[in-house]
Structures are given as C-alpha cells and as structure tokens.
Amino acid sequence: GGGTLQTPHPFTRVLWGRYWTFAHNGQLSGYDKLKTGFIRPVGQTDSELSFCWLLNRLQDRYPEPPQDMVGMFKFVAECCDELRELGVFNMLLSDGEFVMTYCTNHLYWITRRAPFGKAALLDEDVEINFQEETTTNDVVYGIATQTLTGHEKWHRIKPGGAGRCHVG
C-alpha cells in the first residue's frame, strides 16, 4: 500500500504481554482471506494483515507464552511457508529479545562486533563510523533485502530459509 498513517513499517502489536514488531517486504495476493481473529489490522495492507494473521496463529497454537522459543520459531517458519504460497514474503519479527527472519527471494544479514570500523553505503555517498555509534560491548545486526554496504561480508538467506538470533 501507499504511505499513509495506516501503512508504516514496522508494525507493533501485543501478544502474551510483550510487544511484537514486524516488517515485511514483498507483495501477497489473496491475503484478504487471511483470518486474524481478535488481532485486527488498522489498515488494509498485505504486510499488516499477514502480521496479524501470524500473531493469531501463534495465539491459537500457544494460548500461554511458549517455554520453547526454538519450537515456536519453527512454527512461525511453517506459517511463513504458507504465506510464501501467496507471493513474496520476506519478513522480520521480534519480541525485543529474539529476532526472526524469513526469506522468499532476497534477504541478507550481517553481524558487526568490536573493533568497529567504518562502512560505506552502496547506493549513497555516505559513510558510517560504527565506532562513534557503539561501545566495545555492542553487537550490531543488520538485516536487509539487499546488501547495504561494501567491503563487508553479508550473508544471504536462501529462499524458504528462516533465521533467528537472541538479542536480549
């Protein structure tokens, strides 16, 4: 959808007393048939509706917060496989402690640790000095649908692949 108050990324909702944040890249068809239960979208976008559908599926499967987060994220990946059948579905999902990604066609990740250096954006004449923006204890993750910087090792997530990391 276009850029309106109802369509901005990322989207945030509450499930199990925790905030969940979601961003999606791609286009889905037939997404209006997804059942969202009590978790309602504000707008009409495929992104927000698919997020509400994912949270509804999680709530149905896990009425209480799951103890097995690895198992929960495997279930999320299965749900993403279903959404992938509707079109391109690259996504990022986080509860502030864990970050999960799912790739339909193009998704990359990078991890940066001290000693931090500078990184130059590929599509802009901009250089970021991560040493000025971080501490020696920080670990910085980047997730994007295309590599953003040169002279760094970005890792490609294979189509149909999911990834997760613990950041909390």
What are these model-predicted stretches?
Residues 1-168:
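N-terminal segments that mediate ammonia production and transfer
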